[in-house]
Each structure stands twice: as structure tokens, then as C-alpha cells.
Amino acid sequence: TKTADFTVAATESYLINNKTTTSCVVTLPTASSWSGRSLNFTNYQAQTLVSASSNVVARTGGAAGTAILAATVGAWAQIVSDGSNWLTIAGS
């Protein structure tokens, strides 16, 4: 459970955003170093979760941005590295 901005560790794959006051910023691993690996995020607070870099592609496609989770309690997303970016493959 994360209560402040954070960097994803090599041993983590399920991450809970529990930061209460502002958007939570996550530094994702470089997509090229984690090709094929997935990460799962869930919101326990009504705060957005965003990447520190523009490297997340929405389920609808398009250019990579920073958005991972909306500011909704219970929001969740699964992202997978394609070697270039993190692709959102499932979520609410």
C-alpha cells in the first residue's frame, strides 16, 4: 500500500494507491527492461494515479500519456510493457 509518490520495485506487481491529499505519482520501470511484464494498480482513495513519464497508453490507444487511474475509489488498471510503453489492457 502506497501513501506517497513511489517507484515500482522489481519485486512488486500489485500496487495500491492510498495517498490521501493529492494525485499519486508513480515512477514505472523502463518499458524496454520489463517487456511482457504486467503491473496491477488499485485506488483506495479518490485521487488520480499518474506516471512520472509519458509512457502509458490508454485502452483506447493513441499517444502515450501519464494517466493510469481516475480519481475514483475502487478504480483499477492492469498495464503491460510492450518493450516501448506500458499498455493499459484492462481496468475500470
Model-derived segments and spans:
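Exposed extracellular interaction/assembly regions and N-terminal maturation sites
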Residues: 1-58, 82-92
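Terminal beta-strand-rich extracellular "head" domains
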Residues: 55-71
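Extracellular disulfide-bonded cysteine-rich modules/repeats
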Residues: 72-82
